[in-house]
Amino acid sequence: MKQFVRLGTGCVAEQKIGRQKMAIRHFLKLADFTKDELNTMLRRAAEIKALQKAGTPYVPFGGKVLVMIFEKASTRTRVSFESGFYQLGGNVIHLSSQGSQLGRSESIEDTARVVSRMCDLVMIRTFGQDRLEAFANNSRVPVINGLTDEYHPVQIMTDILTFMEHKGSIEGRTVCWVGDANNMSYSWLEAAKILGFHINLAIPEGYPLDLSLIPEGDDYYTVFRDPIEAAKGADLVTTDVWTSMGFEEENEKRRRDFANYQVNSAVMAAANPGALFMHCLPAHRGEEVTAEVIDGPQSVVWDEAENRLHAQKGIMEFCLNASSKA
């Protein structure tokens, strides 16, 4: 498994702008925030969602611009961020490596210095966390992690929002993760430590957790080799594809290694009665999950998919409101 190095940027940065200092709250990884801050984002996400469902106008982003930078392709990330920012009154610009100087020779630092002078918020979906943090370190505006190789914090906030809607607070609950030790699992581990729930991880031999990417301590998670054992006592069972972007050359090997790490009816039966099933999508039915589970009564994947829109509104509002002149 590819190993990564922990970076210590943190989510708070100060940038000098003329004679003023701007205190910037980036959203780079969950470990940068307190329990109260994450709960504030989740609460506001639920409140803003309720306003939309009621047809009540709420457009606090009028006159503001979000720049989205995609070095990794996406469906849900683009649609949810773009729709969400538009719905809150703002405007959106989409950039890709192919359609900007990032794909040629301009450094990530210089791109940040230029782009952040022309917008109010940046979302980046990229490869290494180091690229994201290099951009944030040179940005005048808040930067949101849309996904990196190491972390996927917006998705975990989405999943927790979805859990809260169906089951109430996640504090004191148990989550079961089945599959690879990937960016999703690392953000789940951060969330468990901060928000006070336990996570059981069913991960095959040869795919160890990179301990440099998770909070200290081992009281908030347990690693299993058997998905059924990991699912016992779980209130939520969740998974992801066996082969993440960037590991396509390992696809056949991973199919063999993960063959026994499928969420099926036996795994769900081992979990608590009424346990939820989630998947960040896209899903490969017959591989990491059976059609019976993902299309079954315990699955909330479509509510989960919609909640990317709402969770990210809470995150964007928090970052913009918390980033003020000091």
List each language-model region with its residue ranges.
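Rossmann-like adenosine-cofactor binding region
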Residues: 215-292
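Adenosine-phosphate binding glycine-rich loop
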Residues: 274-275, 281-326
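Anion-binding alpha/beta catalytic cores of soluble intermediary-metabolism enzymes, centered on
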Residues: 113-115, 120-191, 279
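Active-site cofactor/substrate anionic-group-binding motifs, chiefly glycine-
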Residues: 65-66, 70-118
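Glycine-rich phosphate/diphosphate-binding loop of Rossmann-like nucleotide-binding domains
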Residues: 71-83, 167-239
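Positively charged, low-complexity intrinsically disordered leader regions
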Residues: 18-79, 83, 151
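Short Gly/Ser/Thr- and charged-rich N-terminal loops/segments
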Residues: 6-11
